[in-house]
Amino acid sequence: MCGITGYIGKKKTTEVLLNGLYALEYRGYDSAGVAISDGKNLEIIKSVGRVKELETKINKEDKLNSLYGIAHTRWATNGEANLVNAHPHKVGKITLVHNGIIENADTLKEELEQKGYKFNSDTDSEVAAAMLDYKLKDNDILTAIKLTTEILTGSYAFGIMVEGDNSLYALRKDSPLLIGIGDCENFLASDITAIIKYTNKYILLDVGDIAVLTSDTCKIYHDGKPIEKEILISDSKGVDNSKNGYKHHMLKEIMEEPVVLNNLIERYKNKANRSELDLSKYEQIDIVACGSAMYAGLVGQNLFEEYANIKVDVYPASEYRYKKKLYGKNPLVILISQSGETADTIAAMREAHKLGIETLGIVNNPDSTIARECDRKILTNAGVEIAVATTKAYILQVCVLSLMALETAKVKKLVQGDEDYKAFEKLPALLKSVLDNNSYYEKVADSIYQKESCFFIGRGIDYAICMEGSLKLKEVSYLHEAYQAGELKHGTISLVEENMPVLCVITNKALKDKSISNLKETEARGAFGIVITTKDLDDFENYTKIVVPTTSMFTQSMLVVPALQLLSYYVALKRGCDIDKPRNLAKSVTVE
């Protein structure tokens, strides 16, 4: 969600800050701003919209030869997206940027108003700035920060500048923030991608740590005392903002799927590497995730239960921590997150740890909170996704889960032979053949893009596929929704209207007839059907259809979903939607 970066050193401050904000664009935002200082004077420049608009304003308005500064991309949570609510916020001597949610902001605001503070914005962040300014009146800055954090409830990462003090301050609780270490320069950032252009050395802040940065020093304090922190080295390659000739990042990232899939599958051609995939010792698995990652989990659930005989439940992370836990023997909690910083998923992981339950993270970001804190992890190595709607990262999450289900089934001697592993080896080439047919998906999109709603229906694993296909269409073109085919007649069918497209996913021969029966029910009420199926099941002469190659059930979904990703892309393109940055969405959801 919100992105923070800061810099103090000898380079041009605004250039470093803007580069950081551009690298953080993938997180999602609706406004941006910087605060910069030359040691005596402070400038705050904000804009609503893209970082490019902020850069234009900076080029026009910046008059300082600044030495340090902080910057922010905001995704509105408290207060609408406008210039007043954009960060940074200045109250008295304090200027700050904030990622997170201050849950007791309304109460604190009333207290501060009684003390004479007036507020310009609707944000909880301005309340935090005011409280820090109030505490600074009778205390030094480190004490003031400590006292303020004792009052605040909720989550936060702060970058702070103090009038008359030529240092940067940083602290965090639950929201991510790290310190970058350079040569006569230092940085702060929400994640390493914002600063990797300048340094790969960084320090992770723990809750209660306060970082004080000058160009030459980085001091960390905890409970008022200086402490030493390990300097880590990141192997991140940063954000590749190029589109390689494609019109949108989403299309580029879809087309990269065969390559990243091949890289992952190559890792497990060596049988010695497959031991980390074996979950045969567990009798119960909870998969916890949000959004697309949760729908990847639904695919995994179907495969584990069908082929490995392990009971699997899939939960939205936002609900899991509040659920009564009924663990059986040998449980495992699998956490899936592209960013590794999804707030609800992190909270669920920590809840599992409190209960002594083993956790396994499937993550893309090796420097993330989940990657660091889970008991063990598998990295998907999809590379950074710029488009907000995930594509290649989702496919690799499904691939990891599918490989786990297969290896576990083989260890338990429930699946014999090597045919299914061979299906994985053939998968990248088959997927390329699906994606090479992208002009056909554009043609199918012609029958959808002018509609106001759209149903996806399926049974079993096909329903899991429908959920992700529907989410993609919702995210980028604002059309919906997915339903279990057998549940249509229990209420949902009342929503069917004349000429409504209903997409029916059929990859399981045993469920084919029932799914078609449900599709015909919608057609009898005026809908028109579109069938997404496999070559061996294709006898749908009278339907608009998308047909993908037939493969193992362990790999079949990874041919169907990319076809639906392309279909969603072309529907959004024809509707004139902002494909890479859909309205109201953030890539990395770092608040609960």
Residue ranges of predicted features:
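Generic C-terminus detector
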Residues: T551-E592
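Conserved short alpha-helical segments that host acidic/polar catalytic motifs at enzyme active sites
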Residues: M1-K243, K247, E256-N263, K271-K281, ...
